[in-house]
Amino acid sequence: MKLEVLPLDQKTFSAYGDVIETQERDFFHINNGLVERYHDLAKVEVLEQDRTLISINRAQPAAMPIVVHELERHPLGTQAFVPMNGEAFVVIVALGDDKPDLSTLRAFISNGRQGVNYHRNVWHHPLFAWQTVTDFLTVDRGGSDNCDVESIPTHELCFT
């Protein structure tokens, strides 16, 4: 089955998480007016007394065509990815309780200046780069037992 890739924006992505970006966001000045702070762009959640981790993930490009056959979710914490070198990347998400609801399966492509923060329990494809090796600043929960993986019928991404 084909899955159309849509441009990433907060309105269409809001059921799945937060788009981390400065475009059309409020800010205030700090540090004697030298810095614009775009404050509270995503809600970070960590359950069960674990701690929040900040890491860098170096992702390799996916083989083309991009084929989706499994999704994962993290029930005990949110997970954020922000590209550090301005590269666009693709995110694939779905809602659902015990298993992904394929009627909500969506794919989005960022503009290279956007990151994403997946809500807890949102099904998503494991991280990959799109066209070139990409470093991602990653914010997520430390600890174990926080990744459910489900196989799904194969979908091929369709870039229009």
Swiss-Prot record:
Cofactor: Ni(2+)
Record-level GO BP terms: allantoin catabolic process; purine nucleobase catabolic process
Keywords: Lyase, Purine metabolism
InterPro entries: RmlC_Cupin_sf (IPR011051), UAH_cupin (IPR047233), Ureidogly_lyase (IPR007247), Ureidogly_lyase_bac (IPR023525), Ureidoglycolate_lyase_dom_sf (IPR024060)
Record keyword Cytoplasm present: no
Enzyme class: lyase
Pathway of action: Nitrogen metabolism; (S)-allantoin degradation
EC number: 4.3.2.3
Reaction catalysis annotation: (S)-ureidoglycolate = urea + glyoxylate
Function: Catalyzes the catabolism of the allantoin degradation intermediate (S)-ureidoglycolate, generating urea and glyoxylate. Involved in the utilization of allantoin as nitrogen source.
UniProt name for this protein: Ureidoglycolate lyase
